[in-house]
Structures are given as C-alpha cells and as structure tokens.
Amino acid sequence: MVKPKYKGRSTINPSKASTNPDRVQGAGGQNMRDRATIRRLNMYRQKERRNSRGKIIKPLQYQSTVASGTVARVEPNIKWFGNTRVIKQSSLQKFQEEMDTVMKDPYKVVMKQSKLPMSLLHDRIRPHNLKVHILDTESFETTFGPKSQRKRPNLFASDMQSLIENAEMSTESYDQGKDRDLVTEDTGVRNEAQEEIYKKGQSKRIWGELYKVIDSSDVVVQVLDARDPMGTRSPHIETYLKKEKPWKHLIFVLNKCDLVPTWATKRWVAVLSQDYPTLAFHASLTNPFGKGAFIQLLRQFGKLHTDKKQISVGFIGYPNVGKSSVINTLRSKKVCNVAPIAGETKVWQYITLMRRIFLIDCPGVVYPSEDSETDIVLKGVVQVEKIKSPEDHIGAVLERAKPEYISKTYKIDSWENAEDFLEKLAFRTGKLLKGGEPDLQTVGKMVLNDWQRGRIPFFVKPPNAEPLVAPQLLPSSSLEVVPEAAQNNPGEEVTETAGEGSESIIKEETEENSHCDANTEMQQILTRVRQNFGKINVVPQFSGDDLVPVEVSDLEEELESFSDEEEEEQEQQRDDAEESSSEPEEENVGNDTKAVIKALDEKIAKYQKFLDKAKAKKFSAVRISKGLSEKIFAKPEEQRKTLEEDVDDRAPSKKGKKRKAQREEEQEHSNKAPRALTSKERRRAVRQQRPKKVGVRYYETHNVKNRNRNKKKTNDSEGQKHKRKKFRQKQ
C-alpha cells in the first residue's frame, strides 16, 4: 500500500486546545483567542532548535543572525569620550536643601519631577529606620573613625541640642493612657462595645468609595467645618496622600464660615495655610462666598496639567461638612442631593463643572479614632434620630457653648445641670408625656439638631487667639527690696532680689516674650491671607470675647482690595465705552465735566457705604433687627424730604436757582437735535415694538367668531369684497 503524501497545513487541526485557532466554538465561544494572539503567545514560549552538537540550527525571531566571532561595530559618538554625569557633594547638598524647602511649601509645585534626580532626595528620608537596630546593621567602627564607610552618619539629630529637644518633645507628648506596651493588671473590667451607629463612615464600602475618588482625581479637596477645623481633619488621609500619592494636590476648603466670626475664619485660614492651600467658603446658591476664588484656583490647577485633556477634583471629608453643598454652589444649581443629616451621599458621583474640570462627590469618611461617643455626635457624624439616649450628650453641649448664647436661644435664664435644663425646655416648648412629665428624649434630640445645624453659636478658637495682655506691674515687695540693697552696698552692683519675687519676674518676662513672639508670628501669617472676609454674612449673633474689633491693618487691606475692584470695574467700563461709542468727539466735549462729576459722586458714595459697613462690623456687639432698622432710618429720610419740599414751596433760594438753571440746561440739551441711534439700539427698539404673543395681528385684521367686530379695513379685505360683488352680479 502506498504511503499517503504529507498535505501540510491545508488540513484542519481537530484538537480543542486553546492554542488551536481552528478549534470549534463551544457554548462560551465569544471570547476565544484569535490567530494573532496565539502566534504571539507561541513566540514567547518557543525555543531555538539545536542539533546533537549543540549548534543552533533555527534561531528565534528576535535572536541575532550574526555568526559567532564576528566583530560588532560600535556607533561613533563623542559621548564615549566625554565626562560621565557627576555632581559635587556640596551642590548635591544644596539641591537637597532647596528641594526640601520647595516640597514643604504648600504654595509651590514642582512641574517636571521626571527630569530631576528625586531619588537622591527620597533616599535620605527613611521613616522605617526608627524601628531598625542601627548598631546591628551599621557598627560604630564602620560609621565613625578612620575605617568609616559612610560620608554622612544616619542620625535623626544633627547635634546634642536637637537630640535634647527631641527627647523633651517625646516626654511631653507621652500619654500613659495610650501606651499599650505597659503591663497592667487584669481587673476583669471590660469596656462596652460601641453601638453600630457610632461607627458610621468607617465601613469597608465607604472606604472603598474614598479610594476610588482619590485614585481618579488629580486634585483632592478636603472640606472642613469652620466651627471645628482640627476636629474634622483626617490626618490618616493626609499622610496617605503625602507618602503614597505625592503627585496629587491637596487643598483645604473651610466651609460654613458664616457660622463663625470673621476674625476666627481669617486666623484659621492663616493657620491651615501653613500645611496646605486653604480657602474660606460659604456654600449657598443665593449668596455664596469664595466661589470665584475657588473656581480660579481650579483653573490654575487645570493650567498646570496641560498634558491632560481634563482634570478631576475629588471632594472628601467628614460627614455633614457640606461637600455636596460646595459642588452645588460651584454649579449654581442642585446637582447633588443635600440634607442637614449625615450619610445623604451614598456613592461617588461625577459632575461636570467646565469643559476641562470635573468634580467628584464622595460619601463622608471617618477614620477610627479614640473620640468618645459624645465627640462623634457633636461632630455631626451620627443622625440624631438614631441615637437611643440623646439626653446623655446635652451636658457636653452646655459645657462647650457659652451660657449666654444658650439662654438667648432657648429663653431659659438659669439651670443647675443638663437634666434641669432639659426639663425647663420641655415645659417651655410643651414636650410633655402623660401625667405632665417632661419628654427628655425629644427635647434632647431638638437641642442636638440645633447644635448640628448651627443654631447654637459655637466655634473653636484658633491658636494664639487671646488678646494682648498689658504688662503687669511688678509686686511692691520686689520693688522695695532693690533700693534697700543699694543703700546697704552702694559700691556693689545689685545682682539679687527677693528669692521668689525674682523667679516670678523672670517667669513673667519669659511668658511675655514668648507671647509677643507668637503674636508677631501670627501677624506675619495673617498678612499672607488675601481673601476679603468682610463680605461674609455671619448669621449667629456673637458677643463679648468672641467679637474682636477690626484692626487697622485689616481695614487698610479691605480698602485696598475695594479700590482695586473699583479700578477694575472702571477699566471695564472704559473699554466698553470705547468699543460701543460711535459718536464724534466734538459732541462729548460739553458732557465730559458732568460725567467726571457724576463718576466722582458715585465713587464717594461707594466709599461712604464701605466705611459704614466697617463701622457696623467694628461695633457689631449691638445688633438691631432688620425691620426695626428700616423703620428707624426711614423716618429721618421722610422728614428730610418734607423739609426740602416746604423750602421749595416757600421761596426760591440759591439752591432753587441752581436747580432751575440745571433744569433749563437739560431742556436745552433735550431740544437739540437727537443723536443718531446705533444699529444695536435700533434693533432693540424694533424688538420692543414687536408683539410677543403669537397671532395677535391676525385678530386685529380678521373677525373670527365675532371677536373683533370693529376690524380694521385693509386693502386685501376690500379687494376680496369687490371680487365677491362681481361674482354675484355674474350669477
């Protein structure tokens, strides 16, 4: 029998392996490997063919075909003979120091990090060395002395003074209650597990949403509550972004600044600006604050990332701080669901702000901390309706808020404790149970709701917020000791005073110096804040220590900003006037003086209005309701108008003559030939004359169902009647 010939690749391979491109498609044969993918995978797996002697018969596709022993040609280039890339130790040290300062400055951005030797900077920062035994890894002989192998020892203190300071700081920050390494006796007492409602914002799902937002955003905005900015910060997220995502920009937005005095907002912005760029913001669709500055900042970030088609801005923070409200304010309409309770936003949401800027809303996230249940409730993390015993947290509310504010809000003069306060409030509001007993639970929920929604005036004072204390006089005993010593020993210098008195004097002087240094530092920080906080409408009525008078520097800054805005508006008006004006210059010569006088009067009125506002802010401890103020200021104006009318009726005075002369001049100007209208004005007049309703002209000329019996006769209607008469005559 003859052996059949080899037919080659014309036959179909019947195997069902995944490497066979001709295999039969099964039930799930939609996502099978195609022929190109199979060839690529075979290329990865294949081996060169060798004979029995080990010589390559068939090389791989990517292997060189040059025979062994041939001399390869090197490309002629001058770089082979030039110096290699080297750097001096001094210049490297200078680069590291300058880069450190730039990286720590929150208002500076390194544009092209790929072209800089960033590894030289990052290699020095080794936080994991804290837990490593340095003597085991690097002995003293290899680090110091003639046999040292390191140019720079790996130490966390440069000298003894810094080492002592580090030790003192660690001892001051040590808390025995938080030390888990201490051996304690087991007394059998166990802390009760927290309820699930106090763990809101800590679930795995919400943290997954947070990491989704962080990964997909170029700029991360952390929204803080202006009443307690440090309490609503998330240090864990900040350290995570600094270590794991250093290329992402983090900024702070201080929301709800309408619930805090303006001086406190300004100081908090100055304090937080040392870490990250900070903006004060008031989320409102009708009367927002900081919206223009925020959008301008986002545009600057968009210009930084010119290589990207668009940038995404993620909003993160504690629950109920106003993340969704900030997004609605930026869009000027409701695009996110908002509510004064925590947990309204469930999942992340993409919103388009502009063509190149997208906003991402994120649910509120809480990092597990050692806050008590009361702290968690007062931060607004928990919904008040779900708290089983709200009356337990009222004591903290009464401690944090001033008694005068609480008595003003609830019209209760005095109380002994939290329970007494709730009972009085229940009787006053009528929240009673059967038998006339006060409903403490309902009243407690009312108070907590008022606290979370800002109806009770409260805010955490910024650091160094205490006013300057006048230097106190020295005690009389210490002052009297000095002359006695001088009389007894006139030839010797007085070096000692009464023991305790001298120590107290030195302590007071050091305290005053430190206080002055802190105040000077705060003043330097405050000068960097550029926002005009005078435009914030503060809702709560503060008094006493919470009201700080407006400083002269603040007034000057606000006046400068006001004058800058006025100049910008005037420049815009000039540009518009130059573009729109088409009149000859000869006609405008007479009106120039009047226009200048009018502009100056308007400017004076605006400055007067601004100064009145500043005075009102300075003496804002005395507040008058809006209706009462309108009545008070309306009466003098009416009296002034009536007096002017009486004067005009009695006799023509000098002022009356001037008014008559002005009226005559105006009549003369009006009698002159009217100026030619521009095309824009003519089109506007035509549009105003046109009827806005559809079909109005039809009813004017036609009688439809006797709607218009007194119809106007037109040429068309007369022609139609004439035709009808002719037709009847023919018949």
From Swiss-Prot:
Biological classification of the source: Eukaryota, Metazoa, Chordata, Craniata, Vertebrata
Pfam families: MMR_HSR1 (PF01926), NGP1NT (PF08153)
Name of this protein: Nucleolar GTP-binding protein 2
UniProt entry tagged with the keyword Transmembrane: no
Main location: nucleus
Biased composition (Acidic residues): 555-589
Sequence positions that bind GTP: G317, Y318, P319, N320, V321, G322, K323, S324, D361, C362, P363, G364, V365
An example molecular function term from Gene Ontology annotations: GTP binding
Function: GTPase that associates with pre-60S ribosomal subunits in the nucleolus and is required for their nuclear export and maturation. May promote cell proliferation possibly by increasing p53/TP53 protein levels, and consequently those of its downstream product CDKN1A/p21, and decreasing RPL23A protein levels.
Localization of this protein: Nucleus, Nucleolus
Effect of S325A: No effect on GTP-binding, nor on nucleolar localization
Primary gene name: GNL2
N-acetylmethionine PTM sites in chain numbering: M1
GO cellular component: membrane; nucleolus; nucleus
Similarity remark: Belongs to the TRAFAC class YlqF/YawG GTPase family. NOG2 subfamily.
Modified residues (Phosphoserine): S504
Polar residues bias (residue ranges): 10-22
Known outcome of mutating P475A: No effect on nucleolar localization
Alphabetical keyword list: Acetylation, GTP-binding, Nucleotide-binding, Nucleus, Phosphoprotein, Ribosome biogenesis
Region entry Disordered, spans: 1-33, 481-502, 555-594, 630-731
Cross-referenced PROSITE patterns: G_CP
Biased composition (Basic residues): 681-695, 721-731
